Amino acid sequence: MKIGVLGVQGDVREHVEALHKLGVETLIVKLPEQLDMVDGLILPGGESTTMIRILKEMDMDEKLVERINNGLPVFATCAGVILLAKRIKNYSQEKLGVLDITVERNAYGRQVESFETFVEIPAVGKDPFRAIFIRAPRIVETGKNVEILATYDYDPVLVKEGNILACTFHPELTDDLRLHRYFLEMVK
């Protein structure tokens, strides 16, 4: 099994390190043809407008949508969730539009208002998961086929729709590998 981490911008290294701790072969994906070399893909946190601009400049956006629509398992964190969303509230931004959610960018505030909390994620075990929110998006609406796996303050923060796992916080910034392990089970 080989897992790609989209390497255009953001928390690439942190996701690669988490995967290496789990003994997984990784590939930092920087070219469209590399999307065919991976069994699953992580879209890291970063800056979503920069990420979509780079994807378009590299002609990778359409290939990525095609691979996701054909079943490529994807794990998106923070800005990666914005990239995948079908709808963005009160903001005009290009996106991939493959996940049936509406998101609100930077909904928890600016960088200085970033915070940590614990969330319950029954799908990965009974112990609370340390969630780090940094300029995080808020999922304000989910489609009927979107499964909510975790919430914070009544808002979904971890959702799954088919082959897509989307997390508004940063699990890669913790030592807790349960969400990465959960994603690997989706890939198998």
Curated annotation (Swiss-Prot):
Signal peptide: none annotated. L-glutamine binds at G46, E47, S48, R105, I134, R135. PROSITE patterns: PDXT_SNO_1, PDXT_SNO_2. The keyword Lyase applies. Pathway: Cofactor biosynthesis; pyridoxal 5'-phosphate biosynthesis. Its EC number is 4.3.3.6, 3.5.1.2. The active site is at C78, H170, E172. It comes from the Bacteria. GO terms for cellular component: cytosol; glutaminase complex. One of its GO terms (molecular function) is glutaminase activity. GO terms for biological process: glutamine catabolic process; pyridoxal phosphate biosynthetic process; pyridoxine metabolic process. The keyword Cell membrane does not apply. It catalyses: aldehydo-D-ribose 5-phosphate + D-glyceraldehyde 3-phosphate + L-glutamine = pyridoxal 5'-phosphate + L-glutamate + phosphate + 3 H2O + H(+); L-glutamine + H2O = L-glutamate + NH4(+). Pfam families: SNO (PF01174). Keywords: Glutamine amidotransferase, Hydrolase, Lyase, Pyridoxal phosphate. Coiled coil: none annotated. Catalyzes the hydrolysis of glutamine to glutamate and ammonia as part of the biosynthesis of pyridoxal 5'-phosphate. The resulting ammonia molecule is channeled to the active site of PdxS. In the presence of PdxS, forms a dodecamer of heterodimers. Only shows activity in the heterodimer. PANTHER family: PYRIDOXAL 5'-PHOSPHATE SYNTHASE SUBUNIT SNO, PYRIDOXAL 5'-PHOSPHATE SYNTHASE SUBUNIT SNO1-RELATED. Belongs to the glutaminase PdxT/SNO family. This is Pyridoxal 5'-phosphate synthase subunit PdxT. It comes from Thermotoga maritima (strain ATCC 43589 / DSM 3109 / JCM 10099 / NBRC 100826 / MSB8). The gene is pdxT.
